[in-house]
Amino acid sequence: MHERLSDRHVLLLTDYDGTLADIAPTPAEATLSESVRLELATLAAFDDVTVGVVSGRRLDDVLDRVGPAAEYGAGLHGLEMVGPESAFHHYALDSVESVIARLARDAARELQWCPGVLLENKKYALTCHVRLAPPELGDRALEEFEALAEPQLEARTLKLLTGKQALELLPAVDWHKGRAAEWIRARVVPRVDRPVSIVYLGDDRTDEDAFTALGDEDVVIGVGDRPHTHLIDWRLAGPPSVGRFFARLADYRRGAAEET
């Protein structure tokens, strides 16, 4: 990997939940460890490294959690993005806001029978989490959640994403983390003096869209036991291993800078 990156500017893009932070019982409890935060900040300080976070969370939420190390951010799987002097808000978001609000009310009413169900209203997307529900009830709750949105799914107003013990509804547009990675790279390239290689870290099926969008000059790192794809160059066990990887990458970039 170091040979592949030796003469290139590194654009480090990473998912949040399950990659930077351990999966938690609720989204609010998923916090960045101080060790990972420190290593990420160390990398961001290098002139030849740019850091971005690409997440299914709302943009403001994930940027608040990662802090100033992330120069670029993509929320809602890339439907909203921001960087220095640039921002992106997909046109489809505003068209589904009222639909999501109505489905959130319907789901809260219809799924109240199931203990442990958590509905996460992201304004432009709605996620049903069943991590805290009894397994035999959680699967049924997810089926009912999907059924509530069937008219919008059939009309292609919304699409359904499958997560870890969760289902998510969001605008049915051809936009994903792969598009987000391309958008960010296109804005980094004019700002640096050498070719750009993306190092992308992700743990979920939605990250496969980014893996597919990357080229031979890029590095794909899977985190945890998912996703299962031949596109992965290396695999790390979890967020603690991600922190150690950041430390090794920083050591390499520091050594390369001293040699020049």
Question: What kind of feature is each model-predicted range?
Answer:
Residues 1-16, 20-24, 35, 186-190, ...:
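Non-catalytic pre-domain segments flanking phosphatase-related domains
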Residues 7-9, 48, 70, 123, ...:
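A general structural motif
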Residues 19, 59, 206:
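Conserved Rossmann-like nucleotide-cofactor binding loop
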Residues 31-122:
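Active-site phosphate-binding/coordination module
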Residues 106, 120-200, 205-214, 218:
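Conserved acidic, metal-coordinating active-site core of Asp-based
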